[in-house]
């Protein structure tokens, strides 16, 4: 169904004396738009179905125009590297890219993507997008660099059958990290043969390790990654150390998965399509989108999935106010600076993020919507297998990653620290020291601080 192509502007490779051939190639480029996105298997079949539906209507509305997809099969970290190379080259730059919102500032600062303000100023539909989500696609220069099509929250998924076997309460509402650790220890003791606790823990899972694991812990402490008052990165803090210590407790007490399962780029598929449907994991620290793979017609249909696994809020470290924590991010459609067909790309983005197609996307993929109208749609709120109501309730205490252009490099250092602790190659304190050195190297010693 998908037209898999990395479109090259062949005119640059043609006979330079042939003006007719060059004109033909230029014309062809104006009759097609290319959309690059990360294809990570079963985890985003809903995204593909959404894009395919938009493509069909778009081509009907624009006779003679072809929409071509450029799926990039890669781990998260490799995807960003490949995409960066692609958009920097005029011959390979697509017209639209799916942009993880944490990359907006760095890609904008690098000149890789265009601001969209000139289009938004004439687009009345922009008022229907959540203002907090808009912040995630606005760079430090105050300009908008992407139109969001998803947002999310994170929490703890727990298996009600495993909890009952272990004698743990259902519903489960942990009030502190100690409650979470004690539940995992009880599962290990009372229900052998299952993974007590799962959290992404390796470099191969990229931002999922940084955000879904480490930052879900750190932002439940009294500390953060970045001090917006001083505009400095906090490279050492008690909260940072305690977050790594939590990870150490999981793996040193054999409460986590096998390293061969969690240190691979396929970790997301393993937990969502194998361990959870087989009821082989007790607690999973993950996002609201998980049931998207279990929907009817999805990659791993499991209609009763959200009856077996319930979503509960992640507590703060000691239960301190506000009691719970979450992290929110999302994805957007952006236009590379070296795109061939920017105006037509904008027309596609408008259609793809419209009420009609954003509703289709969230129903297919399981993400939360950035649109105010779709958020109130009864079909979305009451969709079978949906956890929209629960996940949306986490927004009131959620946090966002620092919108600073060095964040992607800092995130890579976080992933290295988490993996080092999970594998036991470094102690939590040693891993924090390694992180401090690496971040200082990346951002400069004048841009870091230690919090006592």
Task: Go through each PLM region and give its residues.
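Extracytoplasmic/periplasmic substrate-recognition and gating elements
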Residues: 56, 60-61, 66, 84, ...
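Long, aromatic- and glycine/proline-rich binding clefts that accommodate carbohydrate-like moieties
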Residues: 63, 135-137, 306-314, 328, ...
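Extracytoplasmic/periplasmic solute-binding protein
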Residues: 141-149, 154, 179-239, 272
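Hinge/lid segment of periplasmic solute-binding proteins
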Residues: 101-155, 181, 195, 210, ...
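A structural signal for short loop-to-beta-strand junctions that line the ligand-binding cleft
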Residues: 85, 92-95, 125-163, 195, ...
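Conserved N-terminal structural module of periplasmic/extracytoplasmic solute-binding proteins
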Residues: 5, 10-112, 121-127, 170, ...
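Glycine-centered hinge/linker elements that transmit conformational signals in sensory
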Residues: 183-186, 229-265, 310, 314-317
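Short, solvent-exposed loop/beta-turn-alpha elements that line the ligand-binding surface or hinge
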Residues: 117-129, 173, 201-204, 219-242, ...
């Amino acid at each position: 169904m998908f037209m898999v192509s990395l479109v090259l502007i062949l005119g640059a490779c043609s006979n330079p004396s042939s003006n007719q051939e060059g004109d033909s190639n230029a014309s062809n480029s104006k009759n097609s738009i290319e959309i690059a996105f990360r294809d990570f298997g079963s985890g985003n079949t809903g995204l593909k179905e959404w894009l395919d539906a938009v493509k069909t209507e778009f081509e009907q509305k624009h006779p003679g125009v072809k929409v071509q997809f450029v799926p990039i099969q890669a781990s998260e970290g490799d995807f960003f590297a490949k995409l960066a190379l692609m958009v920097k080259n005029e011959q390979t730059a697509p017209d639209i890219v799916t942009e993880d919102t944490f990359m907006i500032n760095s890609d904008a600062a690098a000149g890789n993507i265009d601001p969209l303000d000139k289009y938004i100023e004439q687009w009345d539909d922009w008022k229907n997008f959540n203002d907090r989500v808009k912040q995630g696609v606005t760079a430090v220069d105050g300009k908008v660099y992407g139109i969001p099509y998803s947002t999310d929250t994170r929490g703890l998924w727990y298996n009600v059958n495993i909890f009952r076997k272990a004698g743990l309460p259902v519903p489960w509402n942990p009030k502190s990290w100690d409650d979470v650790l004690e539940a995992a220890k009880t599962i290990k003791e009372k229900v052998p043969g299952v993974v007590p606790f799962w959290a992404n823990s390796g470099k191969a899972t990229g931002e999922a390790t940084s955000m879904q694991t480490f930052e879900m812990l750190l932002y439940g402490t009294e500390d953060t990654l970045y001090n917006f008052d001083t505009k400095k990165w906090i490279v050492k803090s008690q909260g940072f150390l305690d977050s790594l210590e939590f990870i150490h407790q999981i793996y040193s007490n054999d409460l986590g998965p096998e390293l061969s399962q969690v240190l691979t780029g396929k970790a997301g598929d393993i937990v969502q399509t194998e361990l959870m449907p087989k009821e082989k994991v007790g607690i999973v620290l993950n996002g609201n989108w998980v049931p998207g793979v279990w929907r009817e017609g999805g990659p791993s249909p499991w209609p009763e999935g959200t009856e077996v696994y319930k979503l509960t809020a992640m507590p703060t470290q000691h239960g301190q106010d506000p009691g719970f924590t979450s992290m929110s991010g999302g994805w957007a459609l952006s236009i590379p600076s070296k795109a061939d067909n920017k105006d037509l790309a904008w027309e596609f983005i408008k259609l793809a993020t419209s009420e009609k197609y954003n509703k289709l996307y969230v129903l297919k993929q399981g993400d939360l919507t950035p649109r105010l109208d779709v958020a109130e749609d009864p079909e979305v709120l009451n969709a079978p297998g949906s956890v929209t109501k629960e996940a949306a309730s986490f927004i009131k205490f959620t946090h966002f990653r620092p919108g600073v252009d060095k964040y992607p490099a800092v995130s890579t250092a976080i992933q290295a620290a988490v993996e080092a602790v999970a594998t036991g190659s470094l102690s939590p304190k040693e891993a924090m020291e390694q992180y401090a050195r690496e971040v200082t190297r990346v951002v400069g010693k004048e841009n870091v601080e230690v919090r006592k």
